[in-house]
Amino acid sequence: MMTAVSQMSVPSSRILLDVDCRVCEDHSSGKHYSIFSCDGCAGFFKRSIRRHRQYVCKNKGSPSEGQCKVDKTHRNQCRACRLRKCLEIGMNKDAVQHERGPRNSSLRRQQMMFDHGSSPNSPEMGSESDAIILPTSSMNRDTVAGTAARIFFALVGFCQNPLNGVPKERQMTMFQQNWAALLVLHATETRAITSKQIRTETISGSSEQRNAVANAFEIIERLQLDNREYMMLKHFTMWRDTPSAIQIVFQLASIQNFTHRTEPTRYIQCINAIAAIPTTSIIDVLFRPSIGSASMPRLIQDMFKPPQQPTPTSLFPMANFNLNFLLKQEKTETEEGEDIEEEDDATSSNQFDENSSTDDRSVGELDPVQLFLALNSSTQPSSASSPSSSRPRHSIRSITELLSIQEEESVNVEEV
C-alpha cells in the first residue's frame, strides 16, 4: 500500500505549483531547454526541432496570421504559433540537438543521480536539456532581458511591413515614438513577459520602476484582450498621429459596443496604462542588461540606417593624388596647340574651361563619381576633334606612367 501511494505521488512531485509554464501558463515541471515549462510544451518543442517541422499558421492569409492564442486551453490549436512562442521566450534549439540519449535511458538516469546527488523524482530530473546549470538569479535576468530583446527586434519587422510606402526617416520617427507601447502589447499578448515575472524575478531597475512596469502589465492582463483587439491596438499605437487612427477608433468602438458593452472604458484603460509607463523605466527594467549604457534612440537609428554603398574611390587609390597634375597637363597642351585649326582650338578651349573650374576646387571636395568621370574623359581622345587632329590630347596611358612623369617633373624643378 505504501509503495502504491509513493508511486502515485511521483508525477505530482515534479509539478511546480507556484511556477507557470512560460508557453501555455499551465503548471511547469521544471526547466526544459533553459525555460520553465510543462512536459507537454517541452515535448512538443523537442519533437518539432528534432524532426525539423515547418508549421503553417491556421489563420494564414488573414490579418490575425501568427497571432493565435497559446494557453492551456488553446495550445494544441495552432502548432505554428505554439512553436513561435517557444522560440520567442527563449527555448534553446541547440540543447535539443546536443541531447545525450533518450529520456528513459537507465544509464543516463543513474549518471544524473550520481552527478546531482538527487532522486529521480526531483524537479531537476524533469529538465532533460539543462546541460549547463546557471545560478537562478542570472538565468532569470537573462531570460527576461533576452525575451525583451527578441520581441524588440520582432517589432522592427512588424512595423516595417505596413510602412513600406513611408520614407525611412518617417519610419524611424514613428518607431522611436511608439516602440515601448508596442512592446508592452506584444509581451502581454504572447505572455512572453508577465507582471508576475517582473515583480518576482531578479531583474534590473529600481523597485519604483519595476512596480510601474508591472502595474501596467497587470492592468492589461486583467482585460483579457483577444487577438483581434491586440492587433487593432497595435495599429492604433503605430498610426495614432495620422488620419488612419480615426478609422481604427471607430472599429474599436464597434467591438466594444457589441462585445464588451459592460466595459465602456476597456480600451481607454489599456491605452492609459501604457502611457503611464515612462520609456526610461522600460529600458532600465527590461533592456539594461542587454544594451548596457548604450542609447536606445541611437540603437534604433542604426537599425533603420540604410547600408552604406562602397564608393568608386576605393577602386582608384591614387586618383586623388594625380588629378591636379592631370589637369595641369591639359592646360599646358592646350597652350602649346594655339596654332591648331580653329575648330580644334575651340574644342580645346572649352575643355580647358571645364577643367580649370574643377582645378579651383581641392581634390578632397570632389565627388567620387565626378572623379571617376574626370579620369576617363582625360585619358581618351576627344570625339569632337577634327579628323586632322589624330594624336591623343596627351600620351598618358596609365596611372603608373602618370606617376613616373610626375616624378621626373619634380626632379627638374629641384634642379632649377
Curated annotation (Swiss-Prot):
Tissue expression as described in the entry: Expressed in linker cell.
UniProt superkingdom: Eukaryota
Comp. bias regions, Low complexity: 377-390
Region of interest called Disordered, as start-end residue ranges on this chain: 331-398
InterPro entries registered for this protein in UniProt: NHR-like_dom_sf, Nuclear_hormone_rcpt_NR2, Znf_hrmn_rcpt, Znf_NHR/GATA
PROSITE patterns xrefs: NUCLEAR_REC_DBD_1, NUCLEAR_REC_DBD_2
Comp. bias (Acidic residues): 335-346
Residues of the DNA-binding region: 18-98
Phenotype of gene-disrupted mutants: RNAi-mediated knockdown in males prevents migration of the linker cell (LC) during larval development resulting in abnormal gonad migration. At the L3-to-L4 molt stage, the LC fails to reach the P7.p hypodermal cell and fails to perform the turn from the dorsal to the ventral side of the body. During the late L4 stage, the LC turns ventrally but stays farther behind its normal position. In addition, LC polarization, which normally occurs during the L3-L4 stages, is severely delayed and mig-2 polarization to the adherent side of thr LC is impaired.
UniProt-listed SMART domains: ZnF_C4
Pfam family of the protein (one): zf-C4
GO CC terms in record: nucleus
Keywords: DNA-binding, Metal-binding, Nucleus, Receptor, Transcription, Transcription regulation, Zinc, Zinc-finger
Example GO biological process: negative regulation of G1/S transition of mitotic cell cycle
Family as reported in the entry's similarity comment: Belongs to the nuclear hormone receptor family.
Record's function text: Orphan nuclear receptor that binds DNA containing an extended core motif half-site sequence 5'-AAGTCA-3'. In males, plays an essential role in the migration of the linker cell which guides gonad elongation during the L3 and L4 stages of larval development by negatively regulating the expression of netrin receptor unc-5 at the mid-L3 stage. Involved in the regulation of non-apoptotic cell death in the linker cell, acting upstream of or in parallel to transcription factor hsf-1.
Protein name as catalogued: Nuclear hormone receptor family member nhr-67
Classification lineage: Eukaryota, Metazoa, Ecdysozoa, Nematoda, Chromadorea
Gene: nhr-67
